[in-house]
C-alpha cells in the first residue's frame, strides 16, 4: 500500500488510503497497478478521495511558488477579459482564470501565456498536472503551457450540471418583451417600441401592485373641503395671523424692542375678541384656539398657571421666549395701589377702552428697561426735559389748596386724576429723576405743587403719545401764558400775587432778603454746582438746545449762589420764567418738560421731596437706583420756624444733612436752611425736611447710579457711586 501510494505521489497524485481502496474496488482487474488507479481516479471527483497537499495559505499572498508535480482538478473556467454574457468574444485577447482544487484546498490559476489545451469548453472535473515550479503572485498561480499539462477525465455529475447551466444561459433572453420577461433594452436616444402581445385588459386585472383605493370618495372630499373652508373663515374672523409651533419674532424683545410696543392697540383689540365666546363664530369640532401645546407645557412646568400661560402665548403668537418674559415681568411688577371707594379706577388717557398704563406695560412684556441709544442714555442721566412743566394746567392748580386738605382734594373726582403709571417708567422712559409716579399720596399745596412733576410729566407723556386735541389746546394756551407768570393759574389773592411779584423784582435787582443771599464761601459745600433755584439752570434746557455751552463760565457759580436770594416768598408756581418756553421734542419721543421752581428738574439726582404728597416713588431716579423712598409726610404736622434744627435733603446727592432753618416761606411750602457742617444755604421744600429723630427711620442714601450734571467744572465728584449695568429702554411709538 505504501509502495502504491509512493508511486502515485511520484506521478503527482495525492490520494488518501480510502481513495486508493475505492479506486481499486472500481477497477476490473484483480491486480491493480498505479496506472490502473490513475485511470480510475481521472473519472472520479477528487474531493472525496484526494489528499490535501496545497499550502493552506496559498491564497494569502505569502506563497511565492508551488513545486510540482501535482495533479489538480478544474472546478471552473472563466474568461476575465470579456463580459460574462459574451465570454466567447474575441474583441480582446483571452485571459482565462482557472479555479482548481486538490480535493480540500482551492487555488486560482491565471492564463499568463496562451494555453493551447485549455479553453472555455474544458468541462469541470478535468484533471491537470502542474509541472516544475509554478510562480505564485498574490495568491494567483501564473500558468502557461510549460507549467501545466491537461490529463483529461470526465466527472459525470459535474459535466451534467455545467452543460445545463450553459443551455439556460442561451435561452435566458429569448422572452424579452413577452409576459413575465424582462423589458427590451432600448439604446439611449431612441424611443421605446411597445409590443402588446397580450391582452392589456387581462394584464391590468393581474396587476398586484395597483392601489385599490387611490382616489378618495366624494364624501371624504366634501368633508375635507368643509373643514378647510371653516378653518379659513375662522382665521379671517379672528383678524390675526396665526403662527404655529413658535413664532417668527423669537427674541423680539432684544432684536426689535419696539415691535410689541407699537402694536399695543392691536393687542388690546385681539384680547377683547378672545374674551368673547369663540363658539359664536366657529364650527364645532373644526377649529380651536391654536396654542403651541409644547410651549404651554414648558411654561406650566416653570410654575405658571395654565390660563396665564395660555393667554401669554396667544398674545405673543406662540412665541415661547416673549411669552415667558411677559409672565416674568408681570410677576416682578409691584402691586398697584388700592383704588379708593370715592375714586373711579384710573383710565389710560389717550388709549381708550379703559386700559390703564399698567395693563399696557404688562402686555408689552420683554421691552427693554432703559435707553436704547447712547444719546437717550445720556439724556436720562443728565436730565430729560419736557415742556409740560412750564405749562401747569389750571385744572392742576385748582385742586391744590393746602397741606391739611390736600389729601381730600387729591381724591376729588371732579379734578384731574392722573392715571397710575408703571413704577418702572421713570427708569425706562427717561423721566426727570425727581418727578415720579402719582400714586396713593395726596397732592401738595400750591406752594409745593406748582411743579408737581409726576403729573406734569405724565401730561407731557400723554401729549407726546396720543393725547386728545383738548389736551393740546389747553397746554398750548398755558404755554402762551407761562412766560409771563404762573400766578394766573392759582387761586391765591391778587394782593399776595402782587407782593410776590415785587419780591421777585427785588431779587432780580439784587436787593432781596439778605438771609436768602448767602454766598457759599465759608465751607466746602457738598455740591459743586449751583443751587437748584438758579434761573440759569432752569433755562438750561433751552440754552443747550440753542447751542450754548453746556458748562457756564466761572462767574456762573457766584451767580447761582445769588440765586438763593432770589427765592422770593411766593408760591413756587408764581416764579417768572426766565427765557422763552420751549416745546422742543426730545430725540427719544418725549416732549421737553421744564420747570421754573426752585428745585432743578433736569439733574439726575432725585429732587428734595417736592412731590412726596403726589407720588409714592418721587425719590426714584431715571437711572438704576436702589429703590423708591417712602415719602416724608411728617413735615405736614411740624410747625417749622427759624432757628429749628432739622435734617434737610440736599438735592444733588439725595441725602439728608444736619441743618438749621434760617427762614420759612409765608406760603408754608419752602424754607431756607443752612447746612450745619458746610455752612452753605439751600431753599428746600418743607416736605424734604424732617426732624432729627427721623435720621434712623429712613434710608437717605441712593447708590449705584452714575450722575451726569451740567454746569460743573468738569472735575469728578468725591465719592461718586459706581455705574450699574446699562439697560436699554423700551421703544416708543
Swiss-Prot record:
Keywords for the protein's UniProt record, in alphabetical order: Chromatin regulator, Cytoplasm, Nucleus
Residue numbers spanned by region Disordered: 241-281, 333-630, 706-733
CDD domains tied to this protein: Tudor_TDRD3 (cd20413), UBA_TDRD3 (cd14282)
The keyword Cytoplasm belongs to this UniProt entry's keyword annotation: yes
Cellular location(s): Cytoplasm; Nucleus
TM segment ranges: none
Domain Tudor stretches: 639-699
Domain UBA as annotated: residue spans: 290-330
GO molecular function, one term: chromatin binding
PROSITE patterns (alphabetical): TUDOR, UBA
Entries under Pfam families matching the protein: RMI1_N_C, TUDOR, UBA_7
Function: Scaffolding protein that specifically recognizes and binds dimethylarginine-containing proteins. Plays a role in the regulation of translation of target mRNAs by binding Arg/Gly-rich motifs (GAR) in dimethylarginine-containing proteins. In nucleus, acts as a coactivator: recognizes and binds asymmetric dimethylation on the core histone tails associated with transcriptional activation (H3R17me2a and H4R3me2a) and recruits proteins at these arginine-methylated loci. In cytoplasm, acts as an antiviral factor that participates in the assembly of stress granules together with G3BP1.
UniProt note: domains: The Tudor domain specifically recognizes and binds asymmetric dimethylation of histone H3 'Arg-17' (H3R17me2a) and histones H4 'Arg-3', 2 tags for epigenetic transcriptional activation.
PANTHER family: SURVIVAL OF MOTOR NEURON-RELATED-SPLICING FACTOR 30-RELATED, TUDOR DOMAIN-CONTAINING PROTEIN 3
Name of the protein described by the UniProt record: Tudor domain-containing protein 3
Organism, scientific name: Danio rerio
Lineage: Eukaryota, Metazoa, Chordata, Craniata, Vertebrata
Amino acid at each position: 500500500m505504501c509502495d502504491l501510494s509512493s508511486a502515485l505521489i511520484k506521478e503527482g497524485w495525492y490520494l488518501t488510503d480510502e481513495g486508493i481502496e475505492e479506486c481499486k474496488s472500481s477497477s476490473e482487474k484483480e491486480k491493480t497497478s498505479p496506472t490502473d488507479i490513475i485511470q480510475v481516479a481521472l473519472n472520479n471527483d477528487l474531493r472525496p478521495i484526494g489528499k490535501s497537499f496545497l499550502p493552506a495559505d496559498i491564497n494569502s499572498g505569502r506563497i511565492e511558488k508551488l513545486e510540482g508535480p501535482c495533479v489538480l482538478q478544474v472546478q471552473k473556467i472563466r474568461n476575465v477579459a470579456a463580459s460574462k454574457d459574451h465570454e466567447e468574444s474575441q474583441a480582446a485577447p483571452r485571459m482565462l482564470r482557472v479555479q482548481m482544487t486538490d480535493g480540500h484546498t482551492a487555488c486560482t490559476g491565471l492564463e499568463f501565456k496562451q494555453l493551447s489545451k485549455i479553453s472555455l469548453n474544458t468541462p469541470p472535473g478535468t484533471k491537470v498536472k502542474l509541472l516544475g515550479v509554478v510562480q505564485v503572485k498574490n495568491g494567483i498561480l501564473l500558468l502557461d503551457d510549460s507549467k501545466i499539462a491537461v490529463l483529461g477525465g470526465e466527472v459525470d455529475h459535474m459535466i451534467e450540471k455545467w452543460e445545463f447551466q450553459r443551455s439556460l444561459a442561451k435561452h435566458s433572453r429569448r422572452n424579452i418583451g413577452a409576459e413575465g420577461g424582462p423589458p427590451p433594452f432600448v439604446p439611449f436616444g431612441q424611443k421605446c417600441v411597445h409590443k402588446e402581445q397580450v391582452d392589456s385588459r387581462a394584464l391590468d386585472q393581474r396587476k398586484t401592485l395597483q392601489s385599490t383605493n387611490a382616489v378618495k370618495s366624494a364624501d371624504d372630499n366634501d368633508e375635507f373641503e368643509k373643514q378647510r373652508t371653516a378653518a379659513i373663515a375662522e382665521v379671517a374672523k379672528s383678524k390675526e395671523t396665526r403662527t404655529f409651533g413658535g413664532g417668527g419674532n423669537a427674541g423680539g424683545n432684544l432684536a426689535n424692542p419696539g415691535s410689541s410696543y407699537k402694536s399695543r392697540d392691536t393687542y388690546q383689540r385681539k384680547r377683547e375678541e378672545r374674551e368673547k365666546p369663540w363658539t359664536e363664530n366657529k364650527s364645532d369640532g373644526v377649529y380651536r384656539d391654536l396654542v403651541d401645546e409644547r410651549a404651554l407645557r414648558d411654561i406650566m412646568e416653570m410654575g405658571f398657571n395654565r390660563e396665564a400661560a395660555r393667554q401669554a402665548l396667544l398674545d405673543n403668537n406662540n412665541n415661547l421666549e416673549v411669552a415667558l418674559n411677559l409672565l416674568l415681568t408681570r410677576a416682578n411688577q409691584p402691586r398697584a395701589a388700592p383704588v379708593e371707594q370715592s375714586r373711579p379706577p384710573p383710565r389710560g388717557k389717550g388709549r381708550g377702552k379703559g386700559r390703564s398704563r399698567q395693563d399696557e406695560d404688562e402686555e408689552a412684556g420683554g421691552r427693554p428697561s432703559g435707553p436704547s441709544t447712547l444719546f437717550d442714555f445720556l439724556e436720562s442721566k443728565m436730565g430729560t426735559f419736557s415742556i409740560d412743566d412750564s405749562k401747569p394746567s389750571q385744572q392742576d392748580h385748582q385742586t391744590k389748596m393746602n397741606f391739611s386738605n390736600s389729601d381730600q382734594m387729591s381724591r376729588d373726582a371732579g379734578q384731574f386724576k392722573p392715571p397710575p403709571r408703571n413704577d418702572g417708567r421713570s427708569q425706562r422712559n427717561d423721566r426727570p429723576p425727581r418727578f415720579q409716579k402719582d400714586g396713593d399720596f395726596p397732592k401738595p399745596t400750591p406752594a409745593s405743587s406748582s411743579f408737581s412733576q409726576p403729573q406734569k410729566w405724565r401730561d407731557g407723556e400723554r401729549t407726546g403719545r396720543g393725547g386728545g386735541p383738548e389736551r393740546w389746546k389747553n397746554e398750548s394756551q398755558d404755554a402762551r401764558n407761562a412766560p409771563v407768570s404762573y400766578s394766573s393759574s392759582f387761586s391765591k389773592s391778587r394782593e399776595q400775587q402782587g407782593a410776590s411779584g415785587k419780591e421777585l423784582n427785588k431779587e432780580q435787582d439784587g436787593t432781596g432778603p439778605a438771609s436768602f443771599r448767602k454766598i457759599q464761601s465759608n465751607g466746602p459745600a457738598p455740591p459743586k454746582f449751583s443751587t437748584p433755584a438758579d434761573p440759569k439752570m432752569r433755562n438750561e434746557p433751552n440754552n443747550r438746545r440753542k447751542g450754548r455751552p453746556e458748562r457756564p463760565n466761572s462767574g456762573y457759580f457766584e451767580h447761582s449762589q445769588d440765586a438763593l436770594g432770589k427765592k422770593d416768598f411766593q408760591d413756587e408756581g408764581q416764579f417768572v420764567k426766565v427765557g422763552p418756553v420751549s416745546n422742543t421734542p426730545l430725540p427719544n419721543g418725549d416732549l421737553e418738560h421744564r420747570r421754573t421752581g426752585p428745585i432743578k428738574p433736569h439733574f439726575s439726582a432725585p429732587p428734595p421731596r417736592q412731590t412726596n404728597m403726589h407720588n409714592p416713588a418721587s425719590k426714584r431716579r431715571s437711572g438704576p437706583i436702589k429703590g423708591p423712598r417712602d415719602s416724608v409726610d411728617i413735615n405736614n404736622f411740624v410747625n417749622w420756624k427759624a432757628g429749628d434744627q432739622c435734617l434737610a435733603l440736599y438735592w444733588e446727592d439725595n441725602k439728608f444733612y444736619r441743618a438749621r432753618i434760617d427762614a420759612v416761606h409765608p406760603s408754608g411750602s419752602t424754607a431756607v436752611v443752612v447746612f450745619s457742617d458746610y455752612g452753605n444755604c439751600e431753599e428746600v421744600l418743607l416736605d424734604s425736611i424732617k426732624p432729627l429723630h427721623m435720621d434712623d427711620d429712613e434710608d437717605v442714601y441712593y447708590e449705584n447710579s452714575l450722575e451726569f450734571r451740567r454746569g460743573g467744572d468738569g472735575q469728578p465728584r468725591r465719592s461718586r457711586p459706581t455705574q450699574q449695568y446699562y439697560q436699554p429702554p423700551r421703544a416708543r411709538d
